[in-house]
Design a protein with these regions (language model features):
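PLD/PLD-like phosphodiesterase catalytic module centered on the HKD motif
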Residues: 1-129
């Protein structure tokens, strides 16, 4: 994002585990400060991860971008070299953004002390999650 790349990240409002949710949220501030646009999907739970590049290549799957997913967990991703499919995934993301709330710098900095405490505690556990 700092180099001008359009980075948009969507996290679910309903977590599969509270520690995972709060650990994830603890990194949002850094991403927003770097220029990424971060959203909370208000319409349920998202598990699949999708990355699209320039409308031509996509990567979709369940793997998180962490050491546990790469070396310990059994996760799978598909790399798709199809402009048509990639553009459909981008359209789906755009549609999901209409069901999401953007996390602004201002909103992130106004979090309560309780929320900040949950985030910091969960962030300590993030290598294990």
């Amino acid at each position: 994002a700092r180099s001008g790349v359009d980075v948009r990240i969507m996290i679910p409002c309903k977590p599969d585990h509270p520690f995972v949710y709060w650990a994830t949220y603890s990194y949002i501030g850094e991403m927003v400060e770097a220029g990424a646009k971060c959203y909370v999907y208000d319409n349920g739970f998202l598990h699949a991860k999708t990355v699209t590049v320039d409308g031509t290549v996509a990567c979709v799957g369940t793997a998180n971008m962490d050491f546990r997913s790469f070396g310990l967990n059994f996760e799978v991703n598909a790399v798709i070299y199809s402009e048509e499919t990639t553009q459909k995934l981008e359209q789906r993301f755009e549609n999901d953004m209409t069901k999401s709330t953007q996390i602004t710098r201002n909103a992130y900095h106004q979090r309560s002390l309780v929320i900040r405490g949950k985030e910091q505690f969960s962030r300590l556990l993030s290598p294990l999650l």
